Amino acid sequence: MRKVILFGLLLYVGVATAFGQKSAVQVFGVPFGSTYEEFLTAFKEKGFTGKTYIYEGGSGIDVSSIYGTFMTYECYIELRATKLTHTVYKIKISFSVTDKYKDIPGMEQCRAIISRFEEKYGKATLIQKMHGGKVVQDLEESSAAIWHLDDKIDLELFYRGFDDCKVTYGGKEALDGIFQKEVDQYNQQKAQEIQNQLSGSDF
């Protein structure tokens, strides 16, 4: 009888420990390992439709794929400079969140992009807002965007989850050619093209 009780206690502790580890890392309150439907329900309960908002002063997050414990997001940083009156320079950041932490090589690229922007147009100001958190700035020391999130996303996971960082609308081509173009006109044209593509998109 004692062996049965001991086995039961060990089983309970093992299950509780495993569940606790699984629940420790959450995205919008949903633990990793949850099904696609569970993620989808959680996002929709928070009023998120899955569309990307590009052009109304700020941008949103586009959840481009949710595969079990692997989620890929896309969001947009907007930079406004002191030497420009209304021009906004948009940077697209794609990052992956998994249950296995990884390094964030994309952050160095982000810093380089922002530094190049500041060399050309003056001090940059981040004006982007995002679903589930907000962006604040630390441009004085590192010219890097510091992400300050509320409790909906684990901060450490978010930092370690960066997978890639690119300039919006064209990747390397945009990075190499953006300074030879009228930035505002370029962004408006590309934003309209993407917005047209996304106009009917949802989960």
Go through each PLM region and give its residues:
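Sterically constrained small-residue positions within well-ordered secondary structures
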Residues: 11, 70, 82-84, 136-138, ...
